[in-house]
Amino acid sequence: MMDETFINSYRSPQLSKNWLLNLNPLNKINIYIALGLITLFFQHWQVNVVITLVFILLAVAAGRFKSFISPFLKLGLVIGPFFFIVRAIFWPGENMIFNYGIINITQEGIDLGIQYATIMLVVCGILVLCTVTIKAEDLTYSLEKIGVPHNISFMILSSLQLIIDLKDKTNVIMDSQRSRGIETEGNVFVRIKAFVPVLSPLFLGAISGAEEKTIAMDARAFSSANPNTHLRFLRPTPALEKILVILVDILILGLIILGVVL
Amino acid sequence: MKNRNMGLLIFLIPIGVAVNFVGGQIAVLLKLPLFLDTIGTFTIGAIAGPFAGILVGLLTCLSISITNPQSLFYVINFMLMGLLAGYLAKKGFFTTVPKTIGAGAIMGLIVGISGSLISYFLFNGFGVSGTGVLGGILMGSGVPVWASAFISNMSVDIIDKVPTALVAYLIIRNIPQKTFVKLPNGNVFLNAYKK
Amino acid sequence: MSYIELKNVSYRYPLAETDALKNINYAFEEGKLYGIIGENGGGKTTFCDLIKGLIPSFYGGDLTGEVFIKGKEIREWESSALASTIGYIFQNPFTQISGIKETVFEEIALGLENLGVEREEIIDRVTSVVRQLKIEHLIKNNPNKLSGGQRQRVAFASIIAMETDILVIDEPTSQLDPKGTSDIFEIIHLLKEQGKTILLVEHKIDLIAEYADEVLVIKQGELITNGKTSDVFSNVNLLNEGVNIPQIALLSNDMKEQGKPFDTFAITRSQAREQILKKGSEKICH
Ligand SMILES: Nc1ncnc2c1ncn2[C@@H]1O[C@H](COP(=O)(O)OP(=O)(O)OP(=O)(O)O)[C@@H](O)[C@H]1O
Ligand SMILES: [Mg+2]
């Protein structure tokens, strides 16, 4: 049985029920980065925290809170404290709070640490938000719409798929090496020796596969000079959305000017 | 008819990206004290030239940033490695073991310098991984911030890039001739291995 | 004018010391299925790559002589025009999937997108191929998670959707199980009925006997024999050339040597059965 509803889904633009998810991917990125830029001009950690909260709210608004929060916390709870701690205990400053051996906690170090830790939270927020609200194929579609060649789309999408494929293969090879009695444990030299036999068949196999893929994709008119069409497509950006993005950008620019003046 | 080997480059670049990931993953699984997460950039840069190398570096940086946001700030470094691999390979650097070690050292040095500059100007001299702790310990022992940044970044890069170059060399040695004939830097290797 | 014509074609791969194809002359006619057989390393794949226009543009090397596709020399074809004239399918199911599409439906559409075909037409063509190949149940699946046999069927669908008049098919079943093989041959049968011109490399000799109109035997780069399938297989000496011969053809030959030849030389099971039934009934009549 042919699934007609599925086939019909290609006749209209890919839309979800969520307004935020429906924004053009490039507009999403624009908004996230513009928000992130605020941090650079205010230099107050409180501002950074507020922006981080805005990202969390955006994730909620996109209905993606669950998929956002776990990677965000995993990243943020490692990177934030890391950035804080190295600065707090090592940064050479004047106002000594505690000193023992190489540990040298100063007020300047702590301030710097908080500042950087919260900026990194904002960076993590942008990246995680991008991954949970933008599909790679939608991003490449909108890039192509603004004139990026479809070879670039291919490279991006293909990289993502190959990472998955090669990781799976790695696990298979690691297991088979172990079961063939090739040491993957033991001292450093034993383990270094195990590295090449695992990686090399994967890599060489992939290279010879690339030659075949060139031929296969050639048969699919990959090198065609015609402009290509898109089966799956996104809606043209509505005027309202364009206005929204411009407003957000102006607002943020205003905030930044305010921050610089203050 | 148009030459189709451009196509081959397009398919090799994603492989470089994926191999960077997988190399790093295997290094972790084997608990090696090295990153080995730029083997794809080195190899593809070396065989397919600087431009391909730069793209491998760029795409690797973008995809790795999803799980490792700090990397984003070092994007120049990722691309620099591809550029250098392609350039040095063209000069015949990946054709023998000693030259490969030389290539690794040169790349480690240059990438180390640019990495330290990034760390110095963007991150107060602290690297964003283990190098940050190393740099911190140096600062804590009274070494000036700029020197700590340089020493920590450079040492780590040279220690990692020489073995990375050697692995790339081993891979390249096993690439069949019929593949080399289709690659921008292929002639360098074909001529070197003939002797 | 012949459909595909090779005139004094020789080809040498870069760095190779001997020619992979040696002075080949042949003319293919429209609408026939040509079986290409011969020992390993004989040059069958090289022959296919040549007709697909990959030689010398992809492989490099020295090509002499001329190859005409629909009257136009191969070196003068635009690669996208060639892609919509000649389809190519080969053995490895894994490298023929693009790896950039999320559904089988989109995967099949990829070639049409590249050609710049409009959306409605893409949908029509993909839908109709999906029906023909009976892969309705796969269209929503992720092509990167299919089995080898399924991928190979999707690879066929992707090429068939491009509606090329010529199909070059190189060992499509060598990595498939018997079920996968029979699925693929069902497709090849369908293509043949649609009047496509097909060049098929296949080691499973019984399938060649059953489907091919003409057979070409390539050995060490030379076209050593060609002709109608039953004529080629009636020459048992081919065994000495490293070519398999269908068991049924050997049986027909045995009958001939026994002085009791079939009326027509059988090379497939159904032909043999027909002949045997005929002989049986003749006996009963006597
Ligand atoms: N890319 C290449 N570069 C150099 N020589 C090659 C290349 N591909 C094939 N050859 C050589 O050309 C000859 C013909 O190979 P080809 O692959 O065409 O044979 P085949 O008949 O398809 O064999 P098989 O049945 O194993 O598929 C062989 O000697 C092979 O080693
Ligand atoms: Mg072959």
Question: Which role does the model predict for each range below?
Answer:
Chain B
Residues 7-12, 35-38, 60-64, 78-81, ...:
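Residue-level signal for functionally critical sites in structured catalytic/ligand-binding pockets
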Residues 21-36, 58-96, 129:
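Interfacial aromatic-anchored transmembrane helix boundaries in multi-pass membrane proteins
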Residues 1-47, 51-62:
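Hydrophobic transmembrane alpha-helices
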Residues 12, 16, 20, 41, ...:
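Alpha-helical transmembrane segments in multi-pass membrane proteins
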Residues 29-31, 71-73, 94-195:
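Membrane-embedded alpha-helical hairpins and interfacial helices in multi-pass inner-membrane proteins
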